[in-house]
């Protein structure tokens, strides 16, 4: 999972793509032919389609928009950098939700980002929690 929507990668797609496409072509001291033979697609395509990205960009709407446009929607997972904010967690959670909800996303896409992709990636299922037992516990004085 790339943190912070992959950092600057979505914003530098136009540079990273051609730059990595030339891997080894402009370096005189390294033989990268083995690396190039193992790549089955453009290096940029690994970022876009194989990496997961989290939404921890502290509520930045432009960064959220860029990340959603760059990565496959099935590879984006909600994150907030909690508890590292001035309130110990709630600010970044709240602002991340605000940023995502400010964009024109369908509810199914929001569901993927908020929990669906993480459930699939972690091979978990969304099931109802078992009912809590109502046995009374003695109160401490």
Residue ranges and their predicted role:
Residues 7-8, 32-34, 52-77, 83-141:
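Mid-to-C-terminal alpha-helical segments outside catalytic/metal-binding sites
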Residues 1-50:
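Aromatic-lined glycan-binding groove of carbohydrate-active enzymes
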């Amino acid at each position: 999972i790339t943190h912070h929507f992959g950092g600057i990668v979505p914003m530098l797609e136009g540079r990273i793509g051609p730059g990595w496409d030339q891997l080894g072509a402009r370096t005189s001291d390294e033989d990268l032919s083995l690396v190039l033979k193992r790549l089955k697609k453009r290096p940029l395509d690994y970022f876009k389609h194989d990496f997961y990205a989290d939404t921890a960009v502290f509520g930045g709407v432009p960064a959220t928009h860029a990340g959603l446009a760059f990565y496959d929607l099935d590879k984006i997972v909600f994150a907030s950098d909690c508890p590292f904010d001035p309130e110990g967690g709630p600010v970044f959670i709240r602002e991340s939700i605000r940023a995502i909800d400010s964009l024109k996303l369908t509810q199914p896409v929001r569901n993927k980002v908020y929990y669906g992709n993480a459930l699939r990636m972690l091979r978990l299922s969304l099931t109802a929690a078992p009912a809590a037992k109502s046995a009374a516990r003695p109160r401490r004085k």
